[in-house]
Design a protein with these regions (language model features):
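Hydrophobic transmembrane alpha-helices of multi-pass small-molecule transporters
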Residues: 1-81, 202-345, 363, 442-447, ...
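Helix-loop-helix module between adjacent transmembrane segments
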Residues: 5-7, 84-93, 109-116, 121-137, ...
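Membrane-interfacial loop-to-helix junctions in multi-pass transporters
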Residues: 25-31, 75-79, 107-121, 151-163, ...
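Alpha-helical transmembrane segments of multi-pass membrane proteins, especially transporters
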Residues: 36, 52-56, 73, 81-82, ...
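Hydrophobic alpha-helical segments of integral membrane proteins
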Residues: 70, 97-109, 141, 145-148, ...
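Hydrophobic transmembrane alpha-helices that form the pore/transport pathway of multi-pass ion
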Residues: 106-174, 181-194, 375-406
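Membrane-core helix-loop-helix motifs of multi-pass transport proteins
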Residues: 147, 151-248, 422-454
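C-terminal transmembrane helix pair
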Residues: 156, 204-209, 322-335, 340, ...
Length: 461
């Protein structure tokens, strides 16, 4: 209850302190609103999506943003891409095709040993969480993993298998822009701050190497005490249905179009002279196709059933869209009010520090902060500040923002850190001490891998 009053009180104090200087009204309002939002996001006296409406109400009210600028923030193409991505993921889950992909990958990598079984589940979890939420991935794989544990006589298998699914779901989400909300927050704020855009394929060129390094390291660490023998029989799957095949075809074409829209070679949007094409448009065309293409079944009225219906589509997490829109709104407020320039000027001395040290510090702070706070709320708060700090230090904002976005997916220590951690911990198959012991090492590994990868891959930006 205290946090309910702490938010507006802290905002008022911040406003009074900052507004004493001439011309500081707009920056003071922006900082006050941001502080209020942050406190309510962290302590959640009201739901996080409801808190996300504060910038929408207060920044235009006090003249920091115009209604048109506010609409542009919430109608940003990346907000629309997130909307389309959520609906596509819903169709994939509704069809059941994701379960078949998971079982296929587990069988392909699982082999005939307990250790390889864990790696198989981790590969499936990481791949699926690139395209659907890590929560859905974990919930889908958990029953299969529990069934495998019932048939295993290896007493050391439970915690590595369940932790592997949770950790891989978080790591895999780094791989694509739609894999986890912090990636989209970065892309939205970066676009707003710099006027440039990061394409789907460009993000993957940076992120996939991190996934490919982190995943085997995590697997080797958590399976160090697991037997190399003792295969487990997995549930048999039936033949693919027509609907599953069609959903997978639509999804595969969509992913291919996302990855090839822009790139070093030009991309199809340039070849076809479509300068206004973006990833959100691709997603919406795919969504429309899912509503049109029949699934091969009939509904209760004898009519052809489609691959997607509105009852399924409307169950997407709408609150995430509000949270994302709030982040872009705050970033726009930072720019319009001049607060971004003020922060950048105050942090100019950062340019004297080694780049690797700055990035590692950001990664360390974000990793451990997201152990106790929402990763999307954390990145939404930090992205405008990091962008201003990078500009003040004379570097490209992406050099500070990308490591933060990736690190927000590397909280492995506590059950409350991510939904996959909570879901697997709730099975009661391992203790919180086990998660902390395994997770703290991977947290530090994540800091090291992301810091080095970003310096090597982004250092010439």
């Amino acid at each position: 209850m205290l946090a309910l009053y702490l938010g507006p009180f802290a905002a008022l104090c911040a406003f009074l302190l900052m507004s004493q200087n001439d011309g500081a009204f707009a920056p003071a309002v922006t900082m006050a609103v941001t502080l209020w939002v942050v406190i309510w996001w962290i302590f959640e006296p009201i739901p996080i999506p409801a808190t996300s409406l504060l910038p929408m109400a207060l920044l235009p009210l006090f003249g920091v943003l115009t209604p048109k600028e506010l609409g542009a923030a919430y109608g940003n193409p990346l907000v629309l891409l997130m909307l389309g991505g959520f609906i596509l993921a819903t169709a994939l889950e509704r069809s059941g095709a994701h379960r078949r992909i998971a079982l296929y990958m587990v069988r392909a990598f699982g082999g005939n040993s307990s250790r390889r079984l864990v790696f198989g589940f981790m590969c499936a979890s990481a791949f699926l969480s690139m395209w659907i939420s890590n929560t859905s991935t974990t919930l889908m794989l958990l029953p299969v993993a529990l069934a495998a544990l019932e048939k295993s006589d290896d007493p050391s298998l439970a915690s590595p298998l369940l932790l592997g699914i949770a950790y891989a779901a978080s790591i895999g989400g780094i791989g694509t822009p739609i894999g986890t909300p912090p990636n989209m927050v970065f892309m939205g704020v970066y676009s707003e701050v710099t006027g440039g855009a990061i394409s789907f394929g460009q993000w993957m060129l940076w992120a996939i190497p991190v996934v490919l390094i982190m995943l085997p390291i995590a697997g080797l660490w958590i399976t160090r005490g697991v037997s190399k023998s003792g295969g487990v029989a997995l549930p048999e799957s039936e033949a693919w249905s027509t609907g599953e095949r069609r959903v997978l075809i639509v999804f595969s074409i969509t992913a291919a179009l996302w990855m090839t829209r822009k790139g070093p070679w030009g991309g199809w949007s340039e070849w076809l002279a479509l300068p206004y094409a973006n990833d959100a448009m691709v997603a919406f065309i795919a969504v429309i196709a899912l509503f049109v293409i029949p699934s091969g079944k009939q509904d209760t009225n004898g009519e052809p059933e489609r691959l997607l219906d509105w009852q399924s589509a409307e169950r997407i997490p709408w609150g995430m869209l509000l949270l994302f829109g709030a982040g872009i709104t705050i970033a726009t407020g930072f720019i319009n009010s001049g607060l971004s320039n003020s922060i950048g000027e105050s942090l100019e001395q950062l340019s004297a520090l080694p780049l690797l040290l700055m990035i590692a510090t950001i990664c360390l702070a974000v990793t451990f902060l997201t152990e106790v706070t929402s990763n999307m709320a954390t990145t939404t708060l930090l992205m405008p500040i990091l962008a201003a700090a990078a500009i003040g230090a004379g570097t490209d904002p992406a050099l500070f923002m990308i490591p933060a976005a990736m690190s927000a997916s590397c909280a492995f220590m506590l059950p409350v850190a991510t939904p996959p951690n909570v879901i697997t911990f709730a099975t009661g198959r391992f203790s919180i001490q086990t998660m902390v012991r395994e997770g703290v090492v991977l947290n530090l590994v994540g800091v090291l891998v992301i810091s080095c990868a970003c310096v090597l891959l982004l250092g010439r930006l």
